[in-house]
Amino acid sequence: MAQANLSEILFKPKFKHPETSTLVRRTHCNHVVNIHSALDGDTANHWYRMINRLMWTWRGIDPLEIEEVLSRIACSKAEHSNNELLDTVVGYRNGNWIYEWANQGMMWQQKAMEETDPGSAGQFWLNAANLYSIASYPHLKGDELSEQAEVLSNRAYEEAAKYLPYTLKELTFPISDGGSLSGFLHMPTVGSAPFPTVLMCGGLDTLQSDYHRLFRDYLEPKGIAMLTIDLPSVGASSRWKLTQDTSYLHQQVLQALADVPWVDHQRVSVFGFRFGANVAVRLGYLEPQRVRAVACLGPIVHHLLCNSDSLRKVPDMYMDVMASRLGMADSTDETLNTEMNRYSLKTQGLLGRRCQTPMLAGFWENDPFSPKEEAKLICSSSADGKLLAIPSKPLYENFHRALLQTSEWLEDKMR
């Protein structure tokens, strides 16, 4: 990897790149909907993006570093596409969201290249990968600068694995439409292959490299491997649009695991965050012979997709993410809402029907996107359901405890 010049090559100015918040051409409300969510972060006055301090800190970024980068963005006097929103600086320059986070990532990349201690070098590369991922956030289709930051994130993630005490393999899976899909298999130092494996289904605004901490702290010590696959229209899966068959890609990966020698294909479970739970639960119904168990936190499987009042409270950024994933960047909210109804697993005739696959669903009280009833619907549909209530405070500690309980439950179901 030609690390020294990669960022210069990728971000070499060619033309005036469109600013992220202008890519989806729905009518933005521009009023602040006060949202506080454990998994999604907070809305903030005069910011287009949700500011997700918990998850960014959980991934390993210093909270002070987060505030430092945000302050650089907030102080910019450069041209904005929307003068009311701080993170809408036009062009790849000081104050632009992608520029500032990528610049921070490049600093850690340089430190990693100069570091002689393998453990420190690996951590520095991981820091760079996390910062490049935030630069790319929320990963809207057609955002060229964002896509270039994704390339840097994936390359840094692969570099980190060369120094850290686990094995990372990039696997390629054939897809029925003639394409191929790449995913990362993380293999533990505990035990020996073939490993029980968790197939990770992240949210619509995350990359597969964002879940390293889940593997390192919760799965790896138990001798469990983790396979990450991006959701359709995100990252390595960007060529596929998200359709009502949300598990289209993950199902084909699941069916191919019998041919992967490092994976015990008879001991595979699925873990879904947010909309990733839609994929995970769907797999529990469609592939009960291949899936030992399904776990999900803050699931989006029915309520938000079918409740117009709830959808009206969703911040602009998240509605833009949905429109981008569905290939509906020019649609009205009414058309988008109608289409989203079809993504409900209850509307599809799955949830509510008895399923033999064990399912765990965790929820936070007053979660704006996923009420307790959502998790209860999942658990009551399973012949072996477990409901996990996660207290909101203290936020970080309870998130950690929820992941511990979930990983222990998955370990038990894969024995």
Curated annotation (Swiss-Prot):
NCBIfam families in UniProt: PRK05077.1
DNA-binding in keyword set: no
InterPro entries reported in the protein's UniProt record: AB_hydrolase_fold (IPR029058), FrsA (IPR043423), FrsA-like (IPR010520), FrsA_esterase (IPR050261)
Catalytic activity: a carboxylic ester + H2O = an alcohol + a carboxylate + H(+)
Family membership: Belongs to the FrsA family.
Alphabetical keyword list: Hydrolase, Serine esterase
Record organism: Yersinia pestis
GO molecular function, one term: carboxylesterase activity
Record Gene3D superfamilies: alpha/beta hydrolase
EC code(s) of this entry: 3.1.1.1
Signal peptide: none
Role summary: Catalyzes the hydrolysis of esters.
Protein's name according to its UniProt entry: Esterase FrsA
Pfam family, one: FrsA-like
The keyword Hydrolase appears for this protein: yes
Residue runs in coiled coils: none
